Regions:
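Conserved active-site alpha-helix within GNAT-family acetyltransferase domains
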Residues: 16-26, 120, 129
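Short beta->alpha transition motifs characteristic of CBS
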Residues: 52-53, 113-114, 121, 131-139
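Short, charged, solvent-exposed linker or helix-capping segments at domain edges/interfaces
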Residues: 58-63, 94-95, 142-146
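Conserved acetyl-CoA-binding loop of GNAT-fold acetyltransferases
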Residues: 24-30, 100-104
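Vicinal oxygen chelate
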Residues: 13-16, 70-71, 75-126
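Residue-level recognition of short loop/turn positions
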Residues: 43, 124-126, 147
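Conserved short beta-strand elements that form part of the metal-binding/catalytic scaffold
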Residues: 31-76, 129-134
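N-terminal beta-strand motif that seeds the catalytic metal site of vicinal oxygen chelate
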Residues: 1-19, 80-82, 133-154
């Protein structure tokens, strides 16, 4: 038995508003939607959106045993993230830059990482983080100590 793929499910406040952002800004196509759920695709990528639209937590007594009761509380919207692997990172970066969805701390270009990717981050209309990456060919893996600091090797 093997696993074949993972599908991120991101919490959003309003399904229809989020569908508009994902189709207009990210280039996804809505395959299915109802008031509480949507399935979107672009190329081989599938994303699910679920409605975090329960604001009853605002009127719950302070004695509630935990803040999440229904699992769809509005404060959950925008708290998720996912990573999507792409082939042409520069082209997608330019497209999403024009769409205005790059993360506020964007470096102005895709960034090469120490873990062998080149990537950039975006945020959807609710604040969910979507990072796009591509594998980077490395000639040598970095050596790090237990704190994650680069170690010089000879």
């Amino acid at each position: 038995m093997g696993m074949s793929k993972a599908v991120p499910a991101l919490p959003v406040r309003h399904i229809e508003t989020a569908i508009a952002v994902y189709t207009r800004s990210f280039g996804f196509t809505a395959q299915y939607s109802d008031p509480t759920f949507a399935k979107l695709t672009r190329d081989d990528v599938e994303i699910h959106l679920w409605a975090a639209d329960d604001d009853s937590w605002n009127s719950r007594p302070d004695t509630a045993p935990w803040p999440v009761c229904s699992g769809a509380e509005t404060f959950l919207a925008g708290t998720a993230s996912c990573r999507i692997t792409v082939d042409e990172i520069a082209e997608l970066y330019d497209e999403l830059s024009r769409a205005g969805v790059l993360h506020p701390a964007d470096a102005g270009h895709p960034v090469a990482t120490d873990w062998g990717t080149t990537e950039f981050a975006t945020v959807d209309g609710d604040g969910n983080l979507i990072t796009f990456s591509t594998s980077t060919v490395r000639t040598q893996s970095p050596v790090v100590d237990g704190d994650g600091n680069a170690v010089t090797t000879s």
